[in-house]
C-alpha cells in the first residue's frame, strides 16, 4: 500500500509550495522531488534575471539534506546562494530575504503539517512580474509559472551542480 501511494501521482506545487510525507517516489518529499523543484525555481529565476537566493530550514527529518540539494542546484545554475546557519523559524527566512536583498527565499519546512511530512516554501524579495513582494510568499501567477517549469524538467542528471555558497552569519538572527 505504501509503495503504491509513493508512486500514485505527484506533489502539486502552489502558493503554499510543496508539502507531503517524506518518502520515495514523486508523491513524497525526497531529494529527487526537491531537486526537480529547485531546478524549476532556478529556471524561473533565469527567465526573470533574478540572481540571488537564500535558503533556510527547520529541524524536521530531511530538511538538512533538502537544503544541500537546493543549494547545489542553485549554485550549479549560477545563482548567488546564501544558506541560513542552522534550523530557524520561517519568519527568519522571510526577514533574511529582505535583509540580504535576495531575489528569492526558499524555506524547507512543512509548517504545521504532521511530523512525518516536510515541505518547501518560496518567497520573493523584490518586484517580480509587476508584484512587489518584499520577502513575502509567492502568489499567482508565480506559483503557476514555477509549476510549469517543474513539469518541463524530465531529468535531474542534466542539471549542473555547484558547491559554492555562503553560510549566513548568526548576526542575521540577532537582527531579526
List each language-model region with its residue ranges:
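Alpha-helical scaffold segments in soluble metabolic enzymes
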Residues: 36, 40-43, 92-96, 145-149
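An N-terminal, well-structured beta->alpha segment
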Residues: 1-76, 171-176
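Ferredoxin-reductase
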Residues: 48-128
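Short, amphipathic alpha-helical segments
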Residues: 35, 64, 87, 136-140, ...
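Gly/Ser/Thr-enriched, mixed-charge loops and adjacent short helices
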Residues: 2-11, 119-176
Amino acid at each position: 500500500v505504501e509503495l503504491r501511494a509513493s508512486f500514485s501521482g505527484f506533489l502539486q506545487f502552489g502558493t503554499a509550495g510543496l508539502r507531503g510525507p517524506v518518502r520515495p517516489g514523486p508523491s513524497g518529499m525526497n531529494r529527487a522531488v526537491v531537486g526537480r523543484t529547485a531546478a524549476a525555481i532556478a529556471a524561473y529565476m533565469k527567465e526573470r534575471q533574478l540572481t540571488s537566493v537564500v535558503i533556510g530550514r527547520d529541524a524536521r527529518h530531511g530538511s538538512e539534506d533538502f537544503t544541500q540539494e537546493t543549494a547545489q542546484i542553485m549554485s550549479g545554475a549560477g545563482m548567488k546562494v546564501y544558506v541560513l546557519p542552522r534550523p530557524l523559524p520561517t519568519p527568519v527566512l522571510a526577514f533574511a530575504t529582505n535583509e540580504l536583498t535576495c531575489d528569492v527565499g526558499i524555506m524547507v519546512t512543512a509548517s504545521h503539517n504532521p511530523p512525518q511530512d516536510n515541505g518547501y516554501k518560496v518567497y520573493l524579495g523584490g518586484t517580480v512580474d509587476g508584484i512587489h513582494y518584499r520577502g513575502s510568499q509567492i502568489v499567482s501567477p508565480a506559483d503557476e509559472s514555477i509549476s510549469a517549469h517543474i513539469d518541463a524538467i524530465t531529468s535531474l542528471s542534466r542539471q549542473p551542480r555547484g558547491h559554492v555558497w555562503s553560510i549566513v552569519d548568526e548576526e542575521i538572527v540577532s537582527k531579526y
